Amino acid sequence: MKRPPVPARRPAPLRRSDIPAAGPARRVSGTGSVLSAILDHGPVARSNVARLTGLSPAAVTGHVGQLLARGLVREGAETAGPTGLGRPHIPVEIDTGRYLVAGAHVAVAHSTVSLMDLRGRVVAEDRQPHALGATGPYATVLGRSPRGLSSGPALLRDLADRLPRLVEEHAAGRTVLALGFATGHRVDPAAGVVVEHPHLGWRDVPVREILETATGLPVHVDSHSRALARAEQLFGEASTRVSTVLLFVGAVVDAAFASSGNMHLGPRSGAGSVAHLPLGSGGSGGAEPCSCGRTGCLQSEVSERAMVRRAAEQGLFVGSFAELLDGALAGDERALGLFRRRALLVGRAAALLLDMFDPEVLVVVEPGAGRLPECLADLRAEVARRSWVCDDPERTVVPSSFTGSVLATAGGAVALGALYDDPLGPWPALPAVS
């Protein structure tokens, strides 16, 4: 006699205590608002800063005094009022002659250490391939048998060891205030931890602790997508300041979302995990198997590894993704065709994100969109075909403001974002102010 089937056990209802607390929203101090206004509009008179920020003239005068005391801004030459009448103005602007920030970015195949000034300009960078050693599931982007990457702590200590020489050769007497660190996948900025980076084989790596011990600098940690979205807010086009989606397409594919100027992190630091959006193969060839076991995921179709594999299938054998890009830039039709196919798939993903979030701007961080006009046109055309809410892709979908220096910008932008949010915070290299 058959037993009656046991009914499926219903999952216990989710309790509030089961959900990790979300990190605090980014709150810009009054002094931070003044510093950002000076960044955007300087050299600018204090009276204009008051109008730009909505703060009282007396408050602005106090904030500017603190910023001058910390050496973050400087005064320019006295100028007459706009009509030649009234009191003269002494404009203020960002002082780029005293301080720098350092940046570090870890990609799948290489790492980058950089220096940036307080206007977000890259002063110097040093990119090195990873040393091979401990095992890891995606040691290369070329599809060879993975031999693994250096362990997380060892790689981070190598980054720290490379920084002093960069400072010695390029700082020109300026003091480094802090180190910003960025990488892909899930990063918890409040804890300073890389929660999970499957391509590197990293899980719960205490980046801040390791780098602060190794460098003696304050260390700020975030995902590269959020870092680049913050860089767009600070130093990019004005249209990217308030409501932005940023889509990063490289060896890793992920995204960042900003609303009312604040980045959305998520309670598990997982906001922007778009790698497994199911998009299919774009109608050309079989879909690339994904690490998740499915086919047609966004990352498995458009990642650098997938691009190099597809090139080999077409008889175009290249040693790296960079070599494939060089071919496309030089006019190789097969290489260009691969980037145009990629642009269509990225456009399909962009259309989904536009319909989900309806941002003012969607920034695409992808070298084809940034350097190959045909690819940007194809991407925008695909958005026009597929998005229900985007009625002007030419205005809404834009390439990165940092094409050519994306990874060098990402790490430093983490530190600069923290500085512009709270310039009176605990910055040991800055003079104390009351």
Give the role of each language-model region:
Residues 176-207:
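Gly/Ser/Thr-rich active-site cleft segment
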Residues 1-175, 286-289, 294-434:
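ATP-binding/phosphotransfer module of carbohydrate and carboxylate kinases, centering on a glycine-rich
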Residues 85-88, 189, 239:
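A short, glycine/Asx- and small/polar-enriched loop/turn
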Residues 117, 189, 258:
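Short, acidic, Ser/Thr-enriched surface-loop or helix-capping motifs
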